[in-house]
């Protein structure tokens, strides 16, 4: 049940077909650790769940997110929201996601898959410089252990309630992912950024 009105009537048949095709592909062959739920009644309201990446304060959690396609999509980026409460510098208290891919770095050919991978990468490498949650951004930069404890507590309370019902995202589906290599490259980039960030934080 979307809280925003549908923009389907504002889309050309070509855009509707393009979005429907991509969502269908993502539903049947999702990126690793991500599950996409199709909404036949409103393709402009896309919901997905993301597994908390290993080695982060979000590990073990299942985070539900929503992407809302505006009437100018794909010329304008979708809006992203976490439906699951999360303690993260780039997620506002109302769930709004702040990431450059959804703002100044958006390109019409990026597609829904790239947005989902970017949001997952944000869980691995937060960006405190563009924080929507200033408290989380400050803790990340100045007291990482406190930030990690708070983020883990939020994960434990809010993101693990539905984890048991979504455990099979990574088990049954991961073995048959033809696009896994591309995702692995993306994950390596995230890992490298994470290590660089940790080194930088240690020097502070």
UniProtKB/Swiss-Prot annotation:
SMART domains: UBCc. GO terms for cellular component: anaphase-promoting complex; nucleus. Its EC number is 2.3.2.23. GO terms for biological process: anaphase-promoting complex-dependent catabolic process; cell division; exit from mitosis; free ubiquitin chain polymerization; positive regulation of ubiquitin protein ligase activity; protein K11-linked ubiquitination; protein polyubiquitination; ubiquitin-dependent protein catabolic process. Residues 165-176 have a biased composition (Polar residues). Keywords: ATP-binding, Cell cycle, Cell division, Nucleotide-binding, Transferase, Ubl conjugation pathway. Residues 165-204 are annotated as: Disordered. It catalyses: S-ubiquitinyl-[E1 ubiquitin-activating enzyme]-L-cysteine + [E2 ubiquitin-conjugating enzyme]-L-cysteine = [E1 ubiquitin-activating enzyme]-L-cysteine + S-ubiquitinyl-[E2 ubiquitin-conjugating enzyme]-L-cysteine. It holds the Pfam family UQ_con. One of its GO terms (molecular function) is ubiquitin conjugating enzyme activity. Residues 191-204 have a biased composition (Basic residues). InterPro entries: Ub_conjugating_enzyme, UBQ-conjugat_E2_core, UBQ-conjugating_AS, UBQ-conjugating_enzyme/RWD. Pathway: Protein modification; protein ubiquitination. Residues 14-160 form the UBC core domain. Transmembrane segments: none annotated. The active site is at 98 (glycyl thioester intermediate). Catalyzes the covalent attachment of ubiquitin to other proteins. Acts as an essential factor of the anaphase promoting complex/cyclosome (APC/C), a cell cycle-regulated ubiquitin ligase that controls progression through mitosis. Acts by specifically elongating polyubiquitin chains initiated by the E2 enzyme UBCH10 on APC/C substrates, enhancing the degradation of APC/C substrates by the proteasome and promoting mitotic exit. Belongs to the ubiquitin-conjugating enzyme family. This is Ubiquitin-conjugating enzyme E2 S.
């Amino acid at each position: 049940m979307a809280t925003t009105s549908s923009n389907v009537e504002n889309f050309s048949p070509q855009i509707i077909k393009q979005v429907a095709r991509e969502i269908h592909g993502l539903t049947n062959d999702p990126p690793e650790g991500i599950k996409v739920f199709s909404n036949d009644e409103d393709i402009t309201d896309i919901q997905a769940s993301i597994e908390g990446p290993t080695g982060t304060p979000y590990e073990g959690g299942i985070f539900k997110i929503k992407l809302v396609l505006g009437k100018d999509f794909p010329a304008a980026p979708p809006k992203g929201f976490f439906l699951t409460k999360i303690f993260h510098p780039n997620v506002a208290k109302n769930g709004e996601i702040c990431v450059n891919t959804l703002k100044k770095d958006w390109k019409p050919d990026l597609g829904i898959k790239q947005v989902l991978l970017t949001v997952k990468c944000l869980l691995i490498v937060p960006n405190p410089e563009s924080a929507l949650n200033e408290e989380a951004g400050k803790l990340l930069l100045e007291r990482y252990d406190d930030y990690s404890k708070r983020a883990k507590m939020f994960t434990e309370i809010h993101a693990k309630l539905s984890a048991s019902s979504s455990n099979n995202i990574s088990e049954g589906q991961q073995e048959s992912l033809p696009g896994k290599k591309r995702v692995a490259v993306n994950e390596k980039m995230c890992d490298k950024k994470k290590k660089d960030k940790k080194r930088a934080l240690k020097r502070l």
